[in-house]
């Protein structure tokens, strides 16, 4: 099975601080276009899961038009599960009555979604739960285990996740593979679209092949 790992999309980012309004509006549309292209890639290649490891939105109180845009993309792709872990910039509350059925979310306790022999677990870390979070997740040795986390890697409970085959990280805006003592890989996908000169270079997402990581 193939899964997309993405993060740090920052829908609704206020790019006006660095650009005139007309050019900022163009850049905002390009952020959406990058997200659309990723979803189209998934549909074209029959990838059924898109992981978003935090900072889908740029604000904890995103504009209605940005939420509506995201929900419309999810609803228009019912064959794809969007697994969304909120990050430090993200929307604080999700109205569970309105979210599409194929949008999967997390909380401040570990949540696991099962797809055959593949488990995808995640937790939204806070000051109250991050110190012992890794000790509360039991990853079986005989399954392919993916873990989603958002934050600076040296402050995350990665080394407690011994049986993790792939840790899908968000927070850094460039691709990076982090050293750890888990049995698999620990990866920042980077952002989909750079929003300024400080985010130059190749951007995009990671395609995870579960047959090759376990």
What are these regions (language model features)?
Residues 210-214:
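A short C-terminal boundary segment appended to hydrolase-like catalytic domains
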Residues 1-68, 141-143:
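N-terminal active-site segment of His-dependent metallophosphoesterases
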Residues 49, 58-187, 191-203, 209:
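His/Asp/Glu-rich metal-coordinating catalytic cores
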